[in-house]
């Protein structure tokens, strides 16, 4: 069995958890304008922008390289959490399992955290651990903060 693991980190954000959650849950089409240095495009492959089970295709830049990611969306409104379950793409060439959960938690009236949990399993033990992808998704949440505050 190949190596697997879970990374967890928290990104401090400003404003309301509801507003941030809404952006990640149903406004992905705004990502290229908001954080175009990371995300160049997001398209719907199956479903609707805000539907549980929707399949989206992302064009992004990680470590200076253009990549593509196809994911199935899981939505948990009660816990303000969105899961991106990896289906295909560059990251899936290295990993059998790649699930990223973004959960938005209000800490005070003006402060929230985005708790990011990445669950992964390598295709084989020769593949590197996906720490670069954790760094990437952490930067997505941090860089989206200003754009959400201005919305």
UniProtKB/Swiss-Prot annotation:
SUPFAM superfamilies: Bet v1-like (SSF55961). Pfam families: Bet_v_1. The gene is MLP328. GO terms for molecular function: copper ion binding. This is MLP-like protein 328. Belongs to the MLP family. SMART domains: Bet_v_1. One of its GO terms (cellular component) is mitochondrion. It comes from the Eukaryota. GO terms for biological process: defense response; response to phenylpropanoid; response to zinc ion; vegetative to reproductive phase transition of meristem.
């Amino acid at each position: 069995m190949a190596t697997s693991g879970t990374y967890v980190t928290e990104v401090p954000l400003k404003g309301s958890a509801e507003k941030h959650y809404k952006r990640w849950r149903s406004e992905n089409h705004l990502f290229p304008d908001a954080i175009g240095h990371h995300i160049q495009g997001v398209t719907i492959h199956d479903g609707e922008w805000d539907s549980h089970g929707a399949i989206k295709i992302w064009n992004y830049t990680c470590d200076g390289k253009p990549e593509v990611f196809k994911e199935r969306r899981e939505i948990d409104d009660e816990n303000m959490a969105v899961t991106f379950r990896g289906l295909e793409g560059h990251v899936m060439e290295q990993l059998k399992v790649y699930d990223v959960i973004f959960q938005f938690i209000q800490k005070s009236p003006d402060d929230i955290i985005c708790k990011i949990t990445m669950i992964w399993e390598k295709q084989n033990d020769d593949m590197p651990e996906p720490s670069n992808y954790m760094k990437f998704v952490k930067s997505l949440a941090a860089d989206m903060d200003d754009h959400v505050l201005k919305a």
